[in-house]
Amino acid sequence: KYYGEGELFEYDLLSVCTRAHRPDGTLLFREKLVAEPFLNPVRAIGTMHDYDVFANVVVLTPPQEASRIYEQTKAYIDRQEDIAVGISHLPNDCGLIFKVLGKETSPVKKVVRQFCSTVRMQVKGKPLPEEFAWR
């Protein structure tokens, strides 16, 4: 939106597949995201709607850790910050998926860092270090 003529979603196809397997090859989960803005507008409700930025965090962790992280994380919509946040358990007790929608990169990045700090605190006993000012 800040480039050229303010282009948003000016692409033909976005296809992203995320999957995880156990060391023996057993599939734990698979998520496929496909966007074709010229066939199915991403501004539709249920897709991006009014948001421009999308973040996706996958946490592969044992069920007890996933439950504790899930309990500490709220799903919400903040109309002042223009942020929507969701969290779900992945299938096969393999962890969590955390999603954030926003209108600007900075607030989305902040929410993702807060979540990652919660995860690190739960798993390692230490939060993420503060972000350096020049990043």
Features from the language model and the residues they span:
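A structural signal for small-residue-enriched, beta-sheet-centric alpha/beta enzyme cores
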Residues: 3-135
